Protein backbone atom coordinates (compact mmCIF):
# COMPACT_ATOMS: atom_id res chain seq x y z
CA UNK A 1 0.00 0.00 0.00
CA UNK A 2 1.40 3.37 -0.98
CA UNK A 3 -0.06 6.48 0.59
CA UNK A 4 1.05 9.14 -1.88
CA UNK A 5 -0.82 12.42 -2.03
CA UNK A 6 -0.86 15.28 -4.52
CA UNK A 7 -0.57 18.86 -3.27
CA UNK A 8 -3.56 19.82 -5.45
CA UNK A 9 -6.29 17.71 -7.09
CA UNK A 10 -5.23 15.94 -10.28
CA UNK A 11 -7.30 15.30 -13.39
CA UNK A 12 -10.19 14.69 -13.65
CA UNK A 13 -10.86 16.05 -10.13
CA UNK A 14 -8.82 19.20 -10.86
CA UNK A 15 -11.51 20.38 -13.30
CA UNK A 16 -14.43 19.87 -10.91
CA UNK A 17 -15.62 22.87 -8.85
CA UNK A 18 -16.25 20.56 -5.87
CA UNK A 19 -12.48 20.09 -5.44
CA UNK A 20 -11.47 23.74 -5.97
CA UNK A 21 -8.99 24.74 -3.28
CA UNK A 22 -8.61 21.19 -1.94
CA UNK A 23 -5.18 20.10 -0.71
CA UNK A 24 -5.17 16.28 -0.61
CA UNK A 25 -1.79 16.08 1.15
CA UNK A 26 -3.25 17.89 4.18
CA UNK A 27 -6.64 16.16 4.43
CA UNK A 28 -7.46 13.70 7.24
CA UNK A 29 -7.12 10.07 6.26
CA UNK A 30 -10.07 7.71 6.29
CA UNK A 31 -9.97 4.28 7.90
CA UNK A 32 -7.29 1.80 6.91
CA UNK A 33 -7.79 -1.10 9.31
CA UNK A 34 -7.18 -4.86 9.09
CA UNK A 35 -5.15 -4.85 5.87
CA UNK A 36 -2.45 -7.34 4.91
CA UNK A 37 0.53 -7.28 2.57
CA UNK A 38 2.40 -10.49 1.76
CA UNK A 39 5.47 -10.92 -0.47
CA UNK A 40 5.64 -7.27 -1.55
CA UNK A 41 8.60 -4.94 -1.91
CA UNK A 42 6.87 -2.55 0.49
CA UNK A 43 3.97 -3.47 2.76
CA UNK A 44 3.05 0.12 3.65
CA UNK A 45 4.77 3.31 2.47
CA UNK A 46 3.72 6.80 3.53
CA UNK A 47 5.11 10.33 3.07
CA UNK A 48 5.58 10.85 -0.65
CA UNK A 49 3.70 13.28 -2.92
CA UNK A 50 2.65 13.58 -6.55
CA UNK A 51 3.29 16.67 -8.64
CA UNK A 52 0.65 18.02 -11.00
CA UNK A 53 2.50 16.19 -13.81
CA UNK A 54 2.16 12.90 -11.87
CA UNK A 55 5.88 12.66 -11.08
CA UNK A 56 6.83 11.34 -7.64
CA UNK A 57 8.13 13.82 -5.09
CA UNK A 58 9.93 11.69 -2.52
CA UNK A 59 9.73 12.55 1.17
CA UNK A 60 6.72 14.80 0.89
CA UNK A 61 4.92 14.52 4.17
CA UNK A 62 1.26 13.87 4.76
CA UNK A 63 0.84 17.24 6.43
CA UNK A 64 -2.06 16.70 8.80
CA UNK A 65 -1.72 16.90 12.57
CA UNK A 66 -3.57 13.60 13.04
CA UNK A 67 -3.25 11.43 14.89
CA UNK A 68 -4.11 8.75 12.38
CA UNK A 69 -4.15 5.09 13.39
CA UNK A 70 -3.37 2.20 11.07
CA UNK A 71 -5.04 -0.53 13.16
CA UNK A 72 -4.76 -4.32 13.15
CA UNK A 73 -2.67 -4.78 10.00
CA UNK A 74 -0.44 -7.74 9.10
CA UNK A 75 2.80 -7.63 7.13
CA UNK A 76 4.30 -11.00 6.09
CA UNK A 77 7.42 -11.83 4.10
CA UNK A 78 7.85 -8.40 2.53
CA UNK A 79 11.14 -6.76 1.63
CA UNK A 80 10.11 -3.83 3.88
CA UNK A 81 7.00 -4.04 6.07
CA UNK A 82 6.56 -0.43 7.27
CA UNK A 83 8.31 2.54 5.66
CA UNK A 84 7.70 6.23 6.24
CA UNK A 85 9.67 8.89 4.38
CA UNK A 86 10.66 12.18 5.95
CA UNK A 87 7.51 13.70 7.35
CA UNK A 88 8.79 16.52 9.48
CA UNK A 89 8.62 16.32 13.24
CA UNK A 90 4.92 15.53 13.43
CA UNK A 91 3.96 12.52 15.49
CA UNK A 92 0.81 12.11 13.42
CA UNK A 93 0.76 8.38 12.61
CA UNK A 94 0.45 5.35 14.92
CA UNK A 95 0.76 1.76 13.67
CA UNK A 96 -1.33 -0.02 16.32
CA UNK A 97 -1.72 -3.76 16.95
CA UNK A 98 0.18 -4.89 13.87
CA UNK A 99 1.71 -8.29 13.22
CA UNK A 100 5.00 -8.25 11.35
CA UNK A 101 6.59 -11.61 10.50
CA UNK A 102 9.32 -12.90 8.20
CA UNK A 103 10.06 -9.48 6.67
CA UNK A 104 13.60 -8.58 5.63
CA UNK A 105 13.26 -5.06 7.08
CA UNK A 106 10.38 -4.69 9.50
CA UNK A 107 10.39 -0.98 10.33
CA UNK A 108 12.14 1.93 8.58
CA UNK A 109 10.93 5.32 9.80
CA UNK A 110 12.43 8.55 8.51
CA UNK A 111 9.92 10.39 10.66
CA UNK A 112 8.45 10.45 14.16
CA UNK A 113 5.76 7.79 13.76
CA UNK A 114 4.95 5.28 16.52
CA UNK A 115 4.64 1.48 16.40
CA UNK A 116 2.52 0.45 19.38
CA UNK A 117 1.09 -2.77 20.86
CA UNK A 118 2.40 -4.82 17.95
CA UNK A 119 4.06 -8.22 17.56
CA UNK A 120 7.27 -8.37 15.56
CA UNK A 121 8.49 -11.85 14.61
CA UNK A 122 11.94 -12.47 13.16
CA UNK A 123 11.22 -15.95 11.81
CA UNK A 124 7.83 -17.64 12.14
CA UNK A 125 9.21 -20.93 10.86
CA UNK A 126 7.81 -20.31 7.39
CA UNK A 127 10.86 -18.19 6.47
CA UNK A 128 10.89 -15.07 4.39
CA UNK A 129 10.53 -15.63 0.69
CA UNK A 130 13.58 -13.55 -0.14
CA UNK A 131 15.93 -15.62 2.05
CA UNK A 132 17.65 -12.66 3.73
CA UNK A 133 18.39 -12.12 7.42
CA UNK A 134 15.64 -10.05 9.10
CA UNK A 135 16.16 -6.63 10.67
CA UNK A 136 13.61 -5.36 13.20
CA UNK A 137 14.28 -1.60 13.18
CA UNK A 138 16.51 0.71 11.17
CA UNK A 139 18.04 3.54 13.20
CA UNK A 140 17.18 5.78 10.28
CA UNK A 141 16.35 9.49 9.87
CA UNK A 142 13.53 9.16 12.45
CA UNK A 143 13.30 9.45 15.30
CA UNK A 144 10.61 6.80 15.51
CA UNK A 145 9.03 5.37 18.61
CA UNK A 146 8.38 1.76 19.60
CA UNK A 147 5.94 1.39 22.52
CA UNK A 148 4.73 -1.79 24.26
CA UNK A 149 5.60 -4.26 21.50
CA UNK A 150 6.18 -8.01 21.78
CA UNK A 151 9.30 -9.38 20.10
CA UNK A 152 9.73 -13.01 18.98
CA UNK A 153 12.90 -14.65 17.69
CA UNK A 154 15.20 -11.66 17.68
CA UNK A 155 17.82 -13.59 19.68
CA UNK A 156 18.46 -15.92 16.70
CA UNK A 157 21.93 -15.87 15.13
CA UNK A 158 20.65 -14.61 11.78
CA UNK A 159 18.34 -11.88 13.17
CA UNK A 160 19.31 -8.22 13.53
CA UNK A 161 17.47 -6.20 16.14
CA UNK A 162 18.78 -2.83 14.91
CA UNK A 163 20.43 -1.57 11.74
CA UNK A 164 22.35 1.65 12.48
CA UNK A 165 22.13 3.37 9.11
CA UNK A 166 21.07 6.96 8.67
CA UNK A 167 20.03 8.60 5.47
CA UNK A 168 19.91 12.31 4.60
CA UNK A 169 19.24 13.66 8.10
CA UNK A 170 19.67 11.52 11.19
CA UNK A 171 17.58 12.62 14.16
CA UNK A 172 18.66 11.20 17.53
CA UNK A 173 16.43 9.96 20.33
CA UNK A 174 14.59 7.05 18.81
CA UNK A 175 12.46 5.88 21.73
CA UNK A 176 11.84 2.30 22.80
CA UNK A 177 9.76 1.29 25.82
CA UNK A 178 7.73 -1.60 27.15
CA UNK A 179 9.18 -4.41 25.04
CA UNK A 180 8.34 -7.98 25.99
CA UNK A 181 10.26 -10.99 24.69
Tell me the role of every PLM-derived stretch.
Residues 2-181:
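Extracellular beta-rich repeat passengers
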Amino acid sequence: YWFIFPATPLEPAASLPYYAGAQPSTEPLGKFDRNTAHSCMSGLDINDKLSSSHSILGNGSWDNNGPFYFNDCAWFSNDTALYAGIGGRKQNVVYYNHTLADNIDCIILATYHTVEQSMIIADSGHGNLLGAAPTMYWIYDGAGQMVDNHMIGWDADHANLFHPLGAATKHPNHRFSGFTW
